[in-house]
């Protein structure tokens, strides 16, 4: 089974949400390695929030601020590749926005070859264009690696009818459609990502990635997190 895991940049950072935290990164490696060992084919899209925040770039034009963010995802991807390989895993980076020795152009034959050798695919540079989020990039790259599942790795154990951090009475919604999520105004993903999921028939699983073993449970179809399906 092929799956695209969407990681925020903050997932790589520790207290304060900046930079790289060795313990946090080791945890990510352990969770991904468990999935690889069970035979799952893994792709990753990572954000850049640990390096750059939108508020810090607010004085720039949106296009240039987005370009800085896209380059941040390349930096995070190179970091992840090195850590994965030091842990005995194979990893390859794909991006359309930079020309670096460790970064390949997106090529379907190369992607298929990498998956056959159980390499982790790390997609950097978003969609290659400004104005699109890494949520949209995750869905696009899932389609390119022929995955029908995107796992959104968060700090919350699923989708709620309102923010559980602010409202103690928030109710978890285990299963819903993209149309229902949009109608309820739930910020699972942005509208462009939702529309692409519906068009391509891709399911999104929202999990608390930082509960040990949850990723593997989600991939095995166990009842964790929330599942958002095309309608």
Question: Which role fits each region the language model picked out?
Answer:
Residues 1-231:
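C-terminal catalytic "cap/lid" subdomain
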């Amino acid at each position: 089974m092929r799956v695209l895991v969407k990681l925020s940049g903050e997932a790589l950072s520790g207290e304060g949400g900046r930079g790289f935290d060795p313990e946090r990164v080791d945890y990510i490696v352990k969770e991904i390695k468990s999935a690889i060992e069970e035979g799952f084919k893994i792709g990753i899209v990572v954000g850049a929030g640990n390096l750059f925040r939108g508020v810090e770039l607010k004085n720039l034009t949106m296009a240039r601020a987005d370009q800085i963010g896209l380059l941040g995802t390349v930096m995070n991807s190179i970091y992840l590749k090195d850590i994965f390989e030091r842990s005995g895993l194979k990893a390859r980076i794909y991006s359309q926005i930079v020309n670096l020795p460790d970064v390949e152009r997106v090529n379907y034959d190369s992607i298929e070859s990498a998956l056959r050798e159980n390499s982790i695919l790390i997609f950097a540079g978003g969609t290659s264009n400004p104005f699109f989020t890494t949520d949209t990039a995750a869905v696009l790259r899932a389609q390119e690696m022929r995955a029908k599942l995107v796992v959104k790795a968060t700090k919350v154990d699923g989708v709620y009818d309102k923010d559980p951090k602010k409202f103690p009475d928030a109710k978890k919604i285990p299963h819903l459609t993209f149309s229902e999520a949009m109608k309820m105004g739930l910020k699972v993903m942005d509208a462009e990502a939702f529309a692409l999921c519906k068009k391509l028939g891709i399911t999104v699983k929202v999990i608390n990635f930082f509960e040990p073993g949850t990723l593997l449970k989600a991939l095995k179809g166990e009842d964790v997190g929330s599942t958002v399906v095309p309608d």
